[in-house]
Structures are given as structure tokens and as C-alpha cells.
Regions:
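Generic start-of-chain signal for non-secretory N-termini
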Residues: 1-14, 18-19, 26
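Acyltransferase donor/substrate-recognition loop-hinge adjacent to the catalytic core
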Residues: 2-5, 140-219
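Hydrophobic residues on conserved beta-strands that form the core of alpha/beta folds
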Residues: 4, 78-81, 193, 293, ...
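A conserved beta-strand-loop-helix scaffold within acyl/acetyltransferase catalytic domains
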Residues: 18-61, 66-76, 195-296
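Alpha-helical subdomain
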Residues: 46, 71, 270, 340, ...
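Short hydrophobic/aromatic beta-strand or adjacent loop that forms the aromatic wall/cage
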Residues: 53, 159-163, 346-352
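Flexible loop/turn segments at secondary-structure boundaries
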Residues: 64, 120-122, 171, 255-257, ...
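Acyl-donor binding region in acyl/amide transferases
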Residues: 76-154, 273-341
Length: 356
């Protein structure tokens, strides 16, 4: 009834691997980047040189029913499970998890961590609530029964994350003395908070690389990238950023902070790009109803700067009468309390591990 296949680059298995998400998700739910997945499976992705992928499928009555990839990094005692998809069938999932566990034990790995789709820089975490809402841009969407499948196979939650849902900002409904004072204090000290121009993107992306590499290095599953690979990986952001919602902070000619807020393209950026998609992207980029606060970082030694950076972003949100999402915050971090008065609810995500 069930058959587990570990494959390499065979066309049939690659096509079945890529097909499965379309069988599980509706068009409004799916967040599959098929071209990126294919490049990874064929070791042709810009990041492929950093890891080795081991690919698994499960067939039920000759039909593809589950999939995953185990990512291996040289010198790392952990194996990473990602690109996990499965029909709602606990026995099918058990077959896959059992095969993966046996592989990891055979190769002397100490634990399996996931979901991690090959890299920290691509996608990780599992969504555990608010499945009634359409995915927002960059959200790692999955079926609501996936957590149970992992837990049933002895995985345990090792990290928790939240995304804050902020209510609509308007000129009259929101004032925050804390961020106002922080902003004024930093400006008076000589800090410059500015939005880059699109033509400066090539310069700015290098500044952000240096900050992110330094500030995110203590995150679980973080792996450093070479600067040229980081720039290549994020080159498309040039076309989807609303640069008025990007903030860089300079102090004494040094870049000490950044704040990247994306228009909410939902899942429009996945799949085939046609005229309707391009039109939706164009409209959202000009004036979105919702924005996603995706990346924020402050150099050590500049305590409180994060709240100051938010001030000009909030002013833009008020002017546009938009809602916002503060995305993917490690639970307990100070960023979880940014603009606390406007938080209406929270999306929740987890990272899991299996000790071997």
C-alpha cells in the first residue's frame, strides 16, 4: 500500500515531488516556488554549494502522498527536514518519518530539526494557527494537521515565534509617546533615519548584508553566506520593495540599523507570472492595505533604536490607513512588544526537533 522512495535526479520523482503541493493546497493557500524547488533538487540553486540534499517520497496506491528533503551541512551534527508535505494520513507520515530517522541514525546525526527548507535564507518554521487567513507575503504556510503529524512521531517544539497583527493605523487613532520620544532622542543625538532610493539598491544591499550577518548569527539554524551569494539571492527585492517603507539608520557615517517593510503581496509572487499577477503586484506596491514588517536589525550598542526606526514607518501606515504584521519574532524578544497598543492578535509558528 505504501512505498518509500529515496531519489536523486530522476525526472519522474522530481515531477511527483513538485506536483504534491498542488494536490494538497488551494490556489489561495499554496506558497510553492516551483522553479526554486526544481533548482534545489537538481543542485543548480545559488545556495546548492552550501549543503547536500537527500530527497524522499512516499507513494500510496501508486500515487504520490508525502515528500520531504533532508539537508546536510558539512561539520553540523544536525540534519534538517524540510519541504515536508503529506496528505492527511498518519500512517503515510509515519512511513516517511521512519525512513528519515533511519537515514539520520545510520549517518550518525544527533538530531533532526525542522521544518527547514534547505536553508535559513529560504524558509523555515511551521505555522500552527490562523489557518482561516490567506498567507501573507513570505509566510511559511502549511496544513493545520502537520504539527500533529510531527508530534505523533516524537518531534518536540524547540523554538516559538510570533507575528503580531496590528489593527488599521489612521491619523487619529494612534499616538505612541514612547516611539515619539525615542525618535526625537536619537535624531537629537545625530542619528539619521532615511529611506534609500531604488537607484541606491546595489549599495544598500551590501550594507544590509553586513548587518544581517552580524545580528542574525545567533539565530537557530543560521548559516552564513558569502556576500555575492546574498546579493544574488535577494536581487528580486529591488522590484518588489516600496522603498519608502525601508529604513536605514546612520550614525557617525556607519550603518547601525535597518527596517524592511514589504507590501503584502499575499501569495501572488508564487507560481506563473501573468498580466493579472503583475497588475496586482503593481497595485500593492503603490499602496497596499497591509504591510509586513519582515526584517529589523540594530547594531549592538544602540539600545532603543528599534523603536525609533518604527516611528517614520508608523507615520506612513497612518497616512495610508493600512494594517500591518510584525513578522517572525522569536518569542520573548523585545521586538515582540513594538507598537504594543495596536496588537490585535498573533500568528504563531514553531521549530521542532527529534533527538536521536
Amino acid at each position: 500500500m505504501y512505498k518509500v522512495v529515496k531519489f536523486n535526479e530522476e525526472d519522474k520523482y522530481i515531477n511527483d515531488f513538485l506536483k504534491l503541493p498542488k494536490l494538497i493546497y488551494s490556489k489561495k493557500e499554496i506558497v510553492q516556488n516551483e522553479s526554486e524547488e526544481r533548482a534545489l533538487l537538481l543542485s543548480k540553486h545559488i545556495l546548492s554549494k552550501y549543503f547536500v540534499l537527500h530527497k524522499f517520497l512516499v507513494y500510496k496506491n501508486s500515487e504520490v502522498a508525502a515528500r520531504c528533503v533532508i539537508t546536510i551541512y558539512e561539520g553540523d551534527s544536525s540534519a534538517y527536514i524540510g519541504f515536508f508535505e503529506c496528505i492527511e494520513d498518519s500512517l503515510c507520515a509515519e512511513k516517511l518519518f521512519s525512513e528519515v530517522k533511519a537515514f539520520a541514525i545510520k549517518n550518525n546525526y544527533k538530531k533532526i530539526v525542522g521544518p527547514v527548507d534547505a536553508s535559513f535564507w529560504l524558509k523555515y518554521r511551521m505555522k500552527v494557527n490562523k489557518f482561516e487567513k490567506r498567507p501573507y507575503v513570505s509566510e511559511p504556510y502549511n496544513k493545520n494537521y502537520y504539527l500533529d503529524l510531527f508530534l505523533q512521531n516524537k518531534y518536540k517544539v524547540c523554538e516559538n515565534y510570533v507575528s503580531n497583527m496590528y489593527g488599521k493605523f489612521t491619523p487619529k487613532n494612534f499616538q505612541d509617546e514612547k516611539i515619539e520620544k525615542r525618535y526625537e532622542n536619537f535624531i537629537n543625538k545625530g542619528y539619521k533615519i532615511t529611506s534609500p532610493k531604488k537607484e541606491d539598491y546595489d549599495k544598500v544591499i551590501h550594507e544590509i548584508y553586513r548587518l544581517i550577518t552580524n545580528l542574525y548569527s545567533d539565530f537557530p539554524i543560521f548559516k552564513p553566506l558569502k556576500e555575492e551569494d546574498f546579493v544574488s539571492l535577494f536581487k528580486s527585492y529591488r522590484y518588489i520593495l516600496d522603498f519608502s517603507m525601508v529604513k536605514l539608520v546612520y550614525f557617525k557615517k556607519e550603518t547601525v540599523g535597518f527596517f524592511i517593510c514589504l507590501p503584502d503581496y499575499k501569495n501572488f509572487l508564487y507560481g506563473k507570472i501573468n498580466l493579472i499577477t503583475l497588475f496586482r503586484v503593481f497595485l500593492n506596491k503603490r499602496k497596499s492595505k497591509n504591510y509586513v514588517m519582515l526584517y529589523v536589525g540594530v547594531q549592538r550598542g544602540h539600545l532603543g533604536l528599534g523603536n525609533a526606526m518604527i516611528k517614520p514607518v508608523v507615520e506612513k501606515l497612518k497616512k495610508r490607513r493600512a494594517t500591518a504584521i510584525g513578522a517572525f519574532i522569536r518569542e520573548g524578544k523585545v521586538t515582540e512588544s513594538y507598537v504594543k497598543k495596536k496588537i490585535q492578535s498573533k500568528y504563531r509558528y514553531v521549530l521542532l526537533e527529534l533527538e536521536l
